[in-house]
A protein has these predicted regions:
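Class I S-adenosyl-L-methionine
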Residues: 2-181
Length: 181
């Protein structure tokens, strides 16, 4: 996932990675490792950080010392995290409605967003009963939701042997069209 995101970002600076529903914050840390700009930072946010997240982070730092001081962990709800237009908001396997909340938070500030959704809730969606892949339809709707908010969206996948929930949504605000003088 991180290599797909880094390729999508291309040569644009990462700036700050904000990993929502981060768990151990490994996605954010790998994105920093893939970024040539050592000034990039990361904020790993989860309402319940794993008890041993500091031990895991210390092990990562021991192997990759250039990450020291660049990753901050925050225990918070998604709606309490300050985001900015220059951020890259990422999330891997944000369950159900959390995927929608991640997209909503990123779009509210015009930040770039990369999301690997999971746990697609279909209980209250009778329109999806006859669909072969209801999760694909939900993710199409998420992509269209971003497009309606002025985003360019790419729907990609990561290898299925990495995760069966492997659809990756990548969105960035469309560049403003220059107006004639």
């Amino acid at each position: 996932m991180a290599t797909r995101i880094r390729t999508w970002l291309a040569s644009t600076p990462t700036g700050r990675v904000v990993d929502l529903c981060a768990g151990y914050g490994l996605l954010a840390q790998v994105l920093l490792l893939l970024d040539a700009d050592v000034r990039s930072t990361a904020l790993a946010v989860d309402i319940r950080l794993p008890k041993n997240h500091v031990l895991v982070h210390d092990a990562v730092i021991a192997t990759f010392p250039n990450l020291a001081g660049r990753v901050t962990f925050q225990r918070a709800r998604l709606e309490d995290v300050a985001l900015g237009v220059g951020d890259v908001v990422v999330s891997a396997h944000a369950c159900g409605a959390l995927s929608d909340a991640v997209l909503s938070r990123a779009a509210a500030v015009g930040a770039r967003v990369a999301l690997l959704p999971c746990c697609h809730l279909t209980r209250w969606r009778p329109d999806l009963v006859d669909r072969a892949d209801p999760a694909a339809r939900i993710d199409e709707e998420r992509a269209m939701w971003l497009v309606e908010r002025g985003y360019e969206v790419i729907v990609d996948t990561i290898p299925a042997n990495v995760s069966a929930k492997n659809r990756l949504l990548l969105g960035r605000p469309r560049a403003a069209t220059p107006q004639p003088a």
